[in-house]
């Protein structure tokens, strides 16, 4: 560092020495006049003005010369050999030429790793690198940042003296570089800095980018910064999001796409920014390609940001593109809409027909993605349902046992939701060799997979009487008590309070009933044929892992299960339950219960305790009446 400082001082003093003989006499003449006016005029004279400019502004870099013949030769070179020959020619190289030759070399060899290795051993290349190192303080800013990128792409070793010299020079100049040069470094060099452990340079670069973020005044620079450097600094990304809100009106469709994909990749659910982008997507009739639409659907799905008008537009705009989609794009799109919980029937019917028309191109991974998406949304094709599931079984059954265990469970669970599971598939996942690993694991992911296994076991018990086993062991399906500190939702709390007031005596009903079927009932009551409450504890309860009573149910008596349905349990902007909750309701019915549904949108209309109590009584009467009508 001291050597560099001396070089700069020497350059400054050399220029000052050249100007002093001319300036000094003038200065003496002006001072001899002892006139303030004369002294002022001396400052405006040409010679003293040069000195004032020299002292006021550090002249470190050599002025860039006019475009020379050598510049054209460097630009037009198509082979590394042509560039290396310029070193031994009669051309005079100014301070930038050696760096420009290196930059052009890296461009020509960008996709030729073997030639890069040979070049590193060439004596002319080594001489070129040393020449650049000796002239580094005189290289212009724009050339310097490109030079650093070129040295990274030429894969110089991190211990290389020349590479370290260029990195150090960049660090010296960071404060004086234009913001566009900082952005170029972030765009082209940040990943290399991170990989090659140039952490100090990267940290300083990010610091300057963050300090000067207000200098961003165009959408391209902003989007580039978000995609290339935003993930490296949390505080920088926060500033960039603020800048996005300021410039979002200038964004075109591709820039909006890049911002959304960047947010999705970093799992940054910035609600104000997502709302602003959604507004412009809805209000402006941007022409969007298939790729843009797929990326937008992916980003909104990944961030779970539900915006009705955007979802409607994406579905409507994607529909004409379906004939040109590959099976992979169909699977990706279906998965995105499943995350959004947005079921557009024409779109999903088109997915089904398109996959059936290209069966030979549909791979197992495509089938898995589409099947899981259909199960999440509880989508049953109205046309060609049998053909679709025949294709699914044809692709899935031969390889099901060889798949990753968690994926096996997910796929069979999806088939259970859609009511198209086969006995062989039940046998595959209920085999003791598979469920043992999930039963013993304490990780949340494995526990979730085991819960799906319990649902599959329930499907086999209640909906497939011809299935003879194997089943999960009784000890495995015993319900796990929910934690006492689990926060209750407002609907859950109000429902329990109303039921307690309605039942009065705890013997007449139970709250939060954990069944051996993998589902928890919000409440359970037992009514006789006349609609009067019966004490639950006196009668057998096969749905419990540990029954408490021993008396059979009286003739005409019915068990009633209360199931509340919260807002997240439904498809977006719909009163249709998601597949998981349709399966739960189906299992409870198959277990012999009458179901009283308590959806959030009905409960919100009830204001007084009397209305809530009357609502539940009316629901129970209707359930009993429907059962008698059957």
UniProtKB/Swiss-Prot annotation:
> Which UniProt keywords are listed?
Mitochondrion, Transit peptide
Question: Into which family does the record put it?
Answer: Belongs to the FAST kinase family.
Tell me what this protein is called.
FAST kinase domain-containing protein 4
What Pfam families would the database entry show?
FAST_1 (PF06743), FAST_2 (PF08368), RAP (PF08373)
| Disulphide bridges, residue numbers | none
Q: What does this protein do?
A: Plays a role in processing of mitochondrial RNA precursors and in stabilization of a subset of mature mitochondrial RNA species, such as MT-CO1, MT-CO2, MT-CYB, MT-CO3, MT-ND3, MT-ND5 and MT-ATP8/6. May play a role in cell cycle progression.
The gene designation is Tbrg4
Q: GO CC terms for this protein?
A: mitochondrial matrix; mitochondrion
In terms of one coarse class, where is the protein primarily found?
Answer: mitochondrion
Source lineage: Eukaryota, Metazoa, Chordata, Craniata, Vertebrata
């Amino acid at each position: 560092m001291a050597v560099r400082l001396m070089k700069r001082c020497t350059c400054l003093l050399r220029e000052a020495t050249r100007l002093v003989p001319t300036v000094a006499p003038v200065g003496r003449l002006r001072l001899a006049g002892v006139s303030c006016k004369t002294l002022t005029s001396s400052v405006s004279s040409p010679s003293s003005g040069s000195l004032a400019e020299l002292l006021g502004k550090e002249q470190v870099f050599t002025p860039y010369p006019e475009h020379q013949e050598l510049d054209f030769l460097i630009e037009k070179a198509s082979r590394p050999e042509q560039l290396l020959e310029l070193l031994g020619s009669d051309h005079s190289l100014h301070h930038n030429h050696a760096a420009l030759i290196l930059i052009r070399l890296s461009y020509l060899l960008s996709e030729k790793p073997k030639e890069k290795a040979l070049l590193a051993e060439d004596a002319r290349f080594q001489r070129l690198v040393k020449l650049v190192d000796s002239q580094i303080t005189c290289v212009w800013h724009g050339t310097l940042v490109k030079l650093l990128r070129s040295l990274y792409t030429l894969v110089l070793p991190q211990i290389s003296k020349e590479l370290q010299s260029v990195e150090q020079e960049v660090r010296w100049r960071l404060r004086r570089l234009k913001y566009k040069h900082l952005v170029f470094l972030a765009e082209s060099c940040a990943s290399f800095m991170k990989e090659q452990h140039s952490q100090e340079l990267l940290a300083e670069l990010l610091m300057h980018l963050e300090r000067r973020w207000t200098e961003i005044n165009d959408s391209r620079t902003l989007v580039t910064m978000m995609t290339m450097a935003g993930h490296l600094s949390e505080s920088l990304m926060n500033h960039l999001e603020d800048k996005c809100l300021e410039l979002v009106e200038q964004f075109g469709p591709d820039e909006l796409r890049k911002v959304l994909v960047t947010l999705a990749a970093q799992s940054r659910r910035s609600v104000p920014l997502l709302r602003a982008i959604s507004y412009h997507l809805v209000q402006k009739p941007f022409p969007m390609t298939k790729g843009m639409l797929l990326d937008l659907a992916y980003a909104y799905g990944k961030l779970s940001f539900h915006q009705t008008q955007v979802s409607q537009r994406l579905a409507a705009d994607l529909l004409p593109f379906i004939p040109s989609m590959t099976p992979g794009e169909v699977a990706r799109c279906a998965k995105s809409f499943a995350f959004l919980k947005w079921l557009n029937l024409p779109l999903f019917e088109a997915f089904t027909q398109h996959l059936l028309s290209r069966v030979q191109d549909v791979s197992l991974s495509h089938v898995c993605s589409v099947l899981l998406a259909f199960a999440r949304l509880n989508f049953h094709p109205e046309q060609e349902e049998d053909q679709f599931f025949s294709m699914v079984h044809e692709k899935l059954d031969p390889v099901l046992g060889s798949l990753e265990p968690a994926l096996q469970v997910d796929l069979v669970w999806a088939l259970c939701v859609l009511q198209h599971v086969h006995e062989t598939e039940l046998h595959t996942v209920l085999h003791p060799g598979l469920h043992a690993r999930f039963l013993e694991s304490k990780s949340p992911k494995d526990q979730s997979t085991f819960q799906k296994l319990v649902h599959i076991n329930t499907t086999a018990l209640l909906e497939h009487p011809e299935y003879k086993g194997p089943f999960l062991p009784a000890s495995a399906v015993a319900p796990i008590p929910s934690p006492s500190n689990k926060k209750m939702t407002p609907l859950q709390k109000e429902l329990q309070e109303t039921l307690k007031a309605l039942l009065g005596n705890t013997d007449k009903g139970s709250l939060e009933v954990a069944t051996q079927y993998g589902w928890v009932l919000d409440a359970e009551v037992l009514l006789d044929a006349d609609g009067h409450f019966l004490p639950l504890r006196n009668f057998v309860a096969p749905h419990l892992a540990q029954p408490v009573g021993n008396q059979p149910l009286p003739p005409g008596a019915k068990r009633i299960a209360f199931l509340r349905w919260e807002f997240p349990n439904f498809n977006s902007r719909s009163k249709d339950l998601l597949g998981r909750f349709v399966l739960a309701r189906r299992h409870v019915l198959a277990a012999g219960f009458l179901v009283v549904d308590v959806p959030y949108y009905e409960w919100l209309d009830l204001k007084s305790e009397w209305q809530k109590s009357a609502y539940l009584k009316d629901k129970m009467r209707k359930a009993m009446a429907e059962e008698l009508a059957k």
